[in-house]
């Protein structure tokens, strides 16, 4: 996905989020603000973490009013401390009030993912293993959540189903066997650079190697099974460990020497980073 396409998609999703929240009008703001009055408000971080999503935060207000100005004191990827001032937002107070929740939802969610990803990625430092996300993302938030993973030091697996072949258990069941599924994928999508197959036992590992899989995902296998699987694979395919990956066991898994470790928790279980807009006043 190129930069222009990503921007158009992001704008569309942000606009939909604003429609969802504001609907026909912000009745509370309109009841206390009868006309345009300029104001400013401080963007403050209330937890230590890694910031991500500042441009998305900014875009929320720009789509409501292009005259809104934001001065940031941090950039995406920066480590932030509790109580730190991240920036100042200036503009029509009605816009600041109506856009506040949507803007913060994006920033808190994305910063939470970046923070959690960073804490896991640090455990892989100094190894060859790359930390990957999955497609287990919040509906209509994937473009933002996968960006946040990258900010936190992780890597993106497939963005969508068009990005590559990943043969999972149900695909294999539909095809009839690992071998048949891999051959069908090769016949249908020869332009795809790599074909990945998910395996659950050593027999499937052997079959995937013999069928010529490019990447073999060891899914929910025990540590000892994975050690044996790597001996079977013996460099004939890249390797990925997935399933029940936690911060508590990831260092042990890294010790196996797999090429990739994928974790859905990076996006589906990361807590938000507490960030707020405080001190709104007329200028």
Where are these regions (language model features)?
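Acidic/glycine-rich phosphate/pyrophosphate-binding loops and surrounding catalytic core
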Residues: 2-211, 215, 228-232, 238-241, ...
């Amino acid at each position: 996905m190129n930069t222009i396409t990503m921007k158009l998609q992001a704008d569309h999703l942000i606009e939909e989020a604003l429609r969802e929240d504001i609907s026909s009008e912000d009745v509370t703001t309109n009841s206390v603000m009868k006309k345009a009055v300029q104001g400013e408000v401080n963007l403050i971080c209330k937890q230590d973490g890694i910031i991500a999503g500042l441009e998305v935060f900014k875009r929320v207000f720009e789509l409501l009013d292009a005259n809104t100005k934001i001065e940031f004191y941090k950039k995406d990827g920066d480590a932030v401390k509790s109580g730190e001032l991240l920036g100042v937002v200036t503009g029509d107070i009605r816009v600041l009030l109506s856009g506040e929740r949507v803007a913060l939802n994006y920033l808190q969610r994305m910063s939470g993912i970046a923070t959690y990803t960073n804490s896991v990625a640090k455990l892989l430092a100094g190894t060859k293993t790359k930390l990957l996300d999955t497609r287990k993302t919040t509906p209509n938030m994937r473009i933002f959540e996968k960006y946040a993973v990258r900010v936190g030091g992780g890597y993106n697996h497939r963005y969508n189903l068009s990005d590559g072949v990943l043969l999972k258990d149900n695909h294999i069941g539909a095809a009839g066997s690992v071998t048949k599924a891999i051959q069908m994928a090769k016949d249908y999508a020869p332009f795809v650079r790599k074909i990945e197959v998910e395996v659950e036992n050593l027999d499937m590992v052997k079959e995937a190697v013999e069928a010529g899989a490019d990447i073999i995902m060891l899914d929910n296998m025990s540590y000892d099974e994975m050690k044996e699987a790597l001996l079977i694979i013996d460099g004939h395919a890249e390797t990925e460990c997935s399933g029940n990956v936690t911060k508590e066991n990831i260092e042990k898994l890294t010790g196996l020497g797999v090429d990739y470790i994928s974790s859905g928790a990076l996006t589906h279980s990361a807590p938000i980073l507490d960030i707020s807009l405080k001190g709104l006043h007329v200028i």
